[in-house]
Swiss-Prot record:
GO terms for cellular component: early endosome; extracellular space; plasma membrane; recycling endosome. The gene is TF. Belongs to the transferrin family. Expressed by the liver and secreted in plasma. This is Serotransferrin. Transferrins are iron binding transport proteins which can bind two Fe(3+) ions in association with the binding of an anion, usually bicarbonate. It is responsible for the transport of iron from sites of absorption and heme degradation to those of storage and utilization. Serum transferrin may also have a further role in stimulating cell proliferation. Fe(3+) 1 binds at D62, Y94, Y192, H253. One of its GO terms (molecular function) is ferric iron binding. It is found in: Secreted. Gene3D superfamilies: Periplasmic binding protein-like II. CDD domains: PBP2_transferrin_C, PBP2_transferrin_N. The lineage of its organism: Eukaryota, Metazoa, Chordata, Craniata, Vertebrata. It comes from the Eukaryota. Pfam families: Transferrin.
Length: 696
């Protein structure tokens, strides 16, 4: 096999020199990994174009350029991130913060007329983030942005600004003569330390820096206590509490590649071997993370290593919603759609063809208050909401867990039992997850001997169909090999070649859609999993009402029209079997109701609009043939569960408190078995996931 070669793009003679010694040292050190070759261009933008045009394969970019590279026509994606800090707790981002002196009584929404200190024009923490987030408050016209900022603050020090055209942006700077406001250390208030000194020496009221700046400049805690952070929810917190009080997370520098045919595996293999041989303290011959010919060549000198970025992560998931919003606001041609407080419409995310049809009907009936965005599967929809391409959707608890890890929050819960006036103010305790079998199956089929049986699941990662039964099973067998435990099954969303796709039948109209986690697979969802039991399986993992909803003439489809409720039974955890209507005493676990999720900056808007929509198209509408009904679809649970009585307010909540500790534990056990690509991407920047964006 010919060795793969990764073509690295360089932007200066110094980088080209370091690259050629990288190339020589790698070919000596590594016998059969990928090789590196060097391509020279004159700027990052030229490198981005060269990678798109397949003249080069990789280059390291800062977060702002990762954003540019991800846009059309380049469409590059980040594939490897630099990390800073210790190996056992690698940091792949820093926090941009607003530092103020203790006792200066103003909040984030009262910055107008204050004096400001910035690291430099166009820099992430010092300019892009604070100005992008304050964009809505800036006076019109907002172009050029420097002019708007100059009239927003009373005076500033923004190194690199033009002192002739925007004298107020340089007024507070401390450089002498031509060096005042310079774009380098000749201006004493330049960079992180400079902007902090501008605040410290009382040339400004607020400094826009990164979370470590105060720690680095004031190692003594008593000195740090003289300062505070401004939080976006208009409170203040101590400077050490930056994880709960920051403006945005700025991800570290990343290596970008083409999204299609981008060599990402070779790039990772190359860099992973390179860090083994030439990383921190490895070899005197060549060092990846230091630059004898200059500073930050090819990689940042402060990096301590590389991490592979999950495949599902594109530039906007990597950069995060707050940072992308700030960048978008500041790009001249993209101004924000509407200011934060306006609520013109809710963009609903629909999965697959059937949901999209129902959503389109809803959109027309709502007079455009609901708009539809569609995706192929649930995870792609969640990703669209995270990125701000959609606003809301209703999810099963298993997906609420994933959405929560991605920073979304529950807004309204589906209620299934509560009817009438009070429904909207009383969220329920949850529904029951059960295991259903045919009564005709022998008595030896019970909860304790399911091995080798044929199983039917609503979908992988869903609550009643997967997380609860597989979580319980995992505790018993201590293994993730569920496909070897059951003989065959249909668990939509599994790997196509898995035995858990063997029973799936796909779509009537479009072959090749077997085992997809959407309505193209006829065995998908509650009704689908029950149909799988009826036609092929031994056990179905569903919710407690499914049998009642599809038997005794309630479902008119050919496969269901003659079914009787009495012909099915439930499996209890103690090994017994019970009639279907005794779920209260014979279930696997109580599952949290499905709920609508949104980004936290959209919570109020989504809740208000949906409560209006349900007042118009909710359960009280009797004739669904002539008017639109939110909670009706042909026994398919499209957009919402069909047995939803109303959407109920849940108050300000988090995904953890909504799902409850027991359920989180079940899912956390299964995390070891999880194949969710989105979950990998959303938890990449931090194992402990400090994405508590407080925007109200």
């Amino acid at each position: 096999v010919a060795q793969k070669t990764v073509r690295w793009c360089t932007i200066s003679n110094q980088e080209a020199n370091k690259c050629s010694s990288f190339r020589e040292n790698m070919s000596k050190a590594v016998k059969n990994g990928p090789l590196v070759s060097c391509v020279k261009k004159s700027s990052y933008l030229d490198c981005i174009k060269a990678i798109r045009d397949k003249e080069a394969d990789a280059v390291t970019l800062d977060a702002g350029l990762v954003f540019e590279a991800g846009l059309a026509p380049y469409n590059l994606k980040p594939v490897v991130a630099e990390f800073y800090g210790q190996k056992d707790n690698p940091q792949t981002h820093y926090y941009a913060v607003a530092v103020v002196k203790k006792g200066s009584n103003f909040q984030w929404n009262q910055l107008q007329g204050k004096r400001s200190c910035h690291t430099g024009l166009g820099r992430s923490a010092g300019w892009i983030i604070p100005m992008g987030l304050l964009y809505d408050q800036l006076p019109e016209p907002r172009k050029p942005i420097e002019k708007a900022v100059a009239s927003f603050f009373s005076s500033s020090c923004v190194p690199c600004a033009d002192p002739v055209n925007f004298p107020k942006l340089c007024q507070q700077c401390a450089g002498k003569g031509a060096e005042k406001c310079a774009c380098s250390n000749h201006e004493p208030y330049f960079g992180y330390a400079g902007a902090f000194n501008c605040l410290k020496e009382d040339a400004g009221d607020v400094a826009f820096v990164k979370h470590s700046t105060v720690l680095e400049n004031l190692p003594d805690k008593a000195d740090r206590d003289q300062y505070e952070l401004l939080c976006r929810d208009n409170t203040r917190r101590p400077v050490d509490d930056y994880e709960n009080c920051y403006l945005a997370q700025v991800p570290s520098h990343a290596v970008v590649a083409r999204s299609v045919d981008g060599q990402e595996d070779s790039i990772w293999e190359l860099l992973n071997q390179a860090q083994e041989h030439f990383g921190r303290d490895k070899s005197p011959d060549f060092q990846l993370f230091s630059s004898s010919h200059g500073k930050d060549l090819l990689f940042k000198d402060s990096a301590n290593g590389f991490l592979k970025i999950p495949s599902k992560m594109d530039s906007s998931l990597y950069l995060g919603y707050q940072y992308v919003t700030a960048l978008r606001n500041l790009r001249e041609e993209i101004s924000p759609d509407s200011s934060k407080n306006e609520c013109k419409k809710v963009r609903w995310c629909a999965i697959g063809h059937e949901e999209t049809q129902k959503c389109d009907a809803w959109s027309i009936n709502s007079g455009g208050k609901i708009e539809c965005v569609s995706a192929e599967n649930t995870e792609d929809c969640i990703a669209k909401i995270v990125k701000g391409e959609a606003d809301a959707m209703s999810l099963d608890g298993g997906y609420i867990y994933i959405a929560g890890k991605c920073g979304l929050v529950p807004v309204l819960a589906e209620n299934y039992k509560t009817e009438g006036e009070n429904c909207v103010n009383t969220p329920e305790k949850g529904y029951l997850a059960v295991a259903v079998v045919k009564k005709s199956s022998g008595p030896d089929l019970n909860w304790n001997n399911l091995k080798g049986k044929k199983s039917c699941h609503t979908a992988v990662d869903r609550t009643a169909g997967w997380n609860i039964p597989m979580g319980l099973l995992y505790n018993k067998i201590n293994s993730c090999k569920f496909d070897q435990f059951f003989g065959e099954g249909c668990a939509p969303g599994s790997q196509r070649n898995s035995s858990l796709c063997a029973l799936c039948i796909g779509s009537e109209r479009a072959p090749g859609r077997e085992c997809l986690a959407n309505n193209h697979e006829r065995y998908y969802g509650y009704t689908g999993a029950f149909r799988c039991l009826v036609e092929k399986g031994d056990v179905a993992f569903v919710k407690d009402q499914v049998v009642q909803q599809n038997t005794d003439g309630k479902n008119k489809d050919d496969w269901a029209k003659d079914l009787k409720q009495m012909d099915f039974e439930l499996l209890c955890q103690n090994g017994a079997r019970e009639p279907v209507d005794n779920a209260e005493n014979c279930h696997l676990a109580r599952a949290p109701n499905h709920a609508v999720v949104a980004r936290d900056d959209k919570v109020t808007c989504v809740a208000e609009e949906l409560l209006k929509q349900q007042a118009q198209f909710g359960r009280h509408v009797t004739d669904c043939s002539s008017s639109f009904c939110m909670f009706k679809s042909n026994t398919k649970d499209l957009l919402f569960r069909d047995d939803t009585q109303c959407l109920a307010r849940v108050g300000k909540t988090t995904y953890e408190s909504y799902l409850g500790a027991d359920y989180i534990t079940a899912v956390a056990n299964l995390r070891k078995c999880s194949t969710s690509k989105l979950l990998e991407a959303c938890t990449f920047h931090s194992a402990k996931n400090p994405r508590v964006e407080t925007t109200t």
